[in-house]
Every structure is written in C-alpha cells, then in structure tokens.
Amino acid sequence: MKGRIELGDVTPHNIKQLKRLNQVIFPVSYNDKFYKDVLEVGELAKLAYFNDIAVGAVCCRVDHSQNQKRLYIMTLGCLAPYRRLGIGTKMLNHVLNICEKDGTFDNIYLHVQISNESAIDFYRKFGFEIIETKKNYYKRIEPADAHVLQKNLKISSPGQNADVQKSEN
C-alpha cells in the first residue's frame, strides 16, 4: 500500500478524531483532562494522516521527575490496517527530533502492556530499553502489568567520568 504520510496539529476542531482513534487503538480509555492537556502541548501531539485519512496519533508531555527533564509518550498508535507502513516511525521520529532540537531532555519513556510484543520490538529498534515492570499498572485490562521503556538522550560527558577515575586513585 503506497501512500503519503503526514503529521498534523491536534486542534479543538479535530480533537474528536483523536478521541475516536484512541478508543479504537487502545484498550484503555482516556478522560477529558487527557484531551484538554493534549490541546496545550503543541508539537508534542500530532495526528498522523495516510493519504489524508487520520489513522494514528502521538501524544506526549514533559515530565519533571527523578530530578530529570523527561518526555513521556502518553500514547502512540495507529489503526491496525495501517500498521507497518512507517506511520509509527514517522510519529516517533517527530518526537525524537523535538527532543534533539531542544537538547535539555534527559530521557524519553513510556508504558507498554507486557503482552504487546510488537510495540516492545518497535521501541527497541529505536534504542529504548525495558527499565522496569510495573505490576497492576492498568485497571480493567489483562494483563494488567506494564513495562516501562526508556531511551536515554543525554550521554554523560567525558569530563564527568574523568573526575570519577581521579577520586578512585
């Protein structure tokens, strides 16, 4: 299936499309606050279009936790018939490019249902690693456990390592 993949802004005019996509793609339902927040994150939320049809979306937020600036991928998904066409890759690359241009993010992370092997494989291709598994993360879906996948964006500078070596001598 050949086609044109484009990313578009999420606006009050198309937020209902995002809601419908999320209802179909994800086993979890998102509340009104989720969608209100999505309208305020700018480039961190995008609808994905395949030949002008909305088929997927990515929604992220900036998270300041663990004394770090982190990007949290709340949702990234695509309708089943449109998977493996490069749409997820385009959405993830968009988010990674934002982080790279910004230059101040320590890492990017997300939760994935432990049974979702295709998602886990997808993120691993981009350098994400499973850093922990949260028991009973999801309510009302099975399996309820989620892996936390993370990609580190900051490489510790050589100067820091040199200091550590000096103090050991």
From Swiss-Prot:
- What is catalysed by this protein? N-terminal L-methionyl-L-alanyl-[protein] + acetyl-CoA = N-terminal N(alpha)-acetyl-L-methionyl-L-alanyl-[protein] + CoA + H(+); N-terminal L-methionyl-L-seryl-[protein] + acetyl-CoA = N-terminal N(alpha)-acetyl-L-methionyl-L-seryl-[protein] + CoA + H(+); N-terminal L-methionyl-L-valyl-[protein] + acetyl-CoA = N-terminal N(alpha)-acetyl-L-methionyl-L-valyl-[protein] + CoA + H(+); N-terminal L-methionyl-L-threonyl-[protein] + acetyl-CoA = N-terminal N(alpha)-acetyl-L-methionyl-L-threonyl-[protein] + CoA + H(+)
Instruction: Give one GO term, molecular function aspect.
Output: protein-N-terminal amino-acid acetyltransferase activity
Q: Which enzyme type, at the first EC level?
A: transferase
Asked if the record carries the keyword Membrane, the reply is no
Per UniProt, substrate binds at: Y30, M74
Compartment list: Cytoplasm; Nucleus
Write the Enzyme Commission number(s) for this entry.
2.3.1.258, 2.3.1.-
Catalytic-site annotation from UniProt: Y72, H111
Name the GO terms of the biological process aspect: establishment of mitotic sister chromatid cohesion; mitotic sister chromatid cohesion, centromeric; N-terminal protein amino acid acetylation
What are its GO cellular component terms?
Answer: cytoplasm; cytosol; nucleus
Occurrences of domain N-acetyltransferase (ranges): 5-154
Kindly state which keywords UniProt assigns to this record, in alphabetical order. Answer: Acyltransferase, Cytoplasm, Nucleus, Transferase
* Annotated binding of acetyl-CoA, by residue: L76, G77, C78, L79, A80, P81, Y82, R83, R84, L85, G86, I87, G88, T89
Name the protein family.
Belongs to the acetyltransferase family. GNAT subfamily.
Q: Which PANTHER family match?
A: N-ALPHA-ACETYLTRANSFERASE (PTHR42919), N-ALPHA-ACETYLTRANSFERASE 50 (PTHR42919:SF41)
What protein name applies here? N-alpha-acetyltransferase 50
